[in-house]
């Protein structure tokens, strides 16, 4: 399924101005910067049980609240900082999600130390090359794959939280490890075929 807006054919989930901008500029674009990868990992975890539109609306607030997703700073958050975040109505005030952000920052730094970068680590799950799918409709797109299962298992082993396979697959889609734009979407070809 696709949606048309200004004669461009898009994936059908891009329905409002915010999601259209995200779809057209970010979703599925191969991402290699560690801070950007960390941002998406945290946002995908925050989205668990909520709509992605909710997270997109709060994204700027998350950047401000979480020191622009600087993992070194977040890894040093203490109980008082977590309490402060729990009182911040501009973000999702879920104690487990906020605590996992701190834990994920610590685990992220360890991965950077071990692999040289989080980018080098995370792209190994697709053999360092974007996987390009050929879906004709959103109904065909899976919620998880063997690659997201493997990523989830390894991230959990390394101490990350809120990284179930479905969250990992959404992360893979967001940062372009996979191109899951439907084939009729103008972004499918614009991003490339791997």
Regions found by a protein language model. Give the residues of each.
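HhH-family (HhH-GPD) DNA N-glycosylase catalytic core used in base-excision repair
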Residues: 1-194
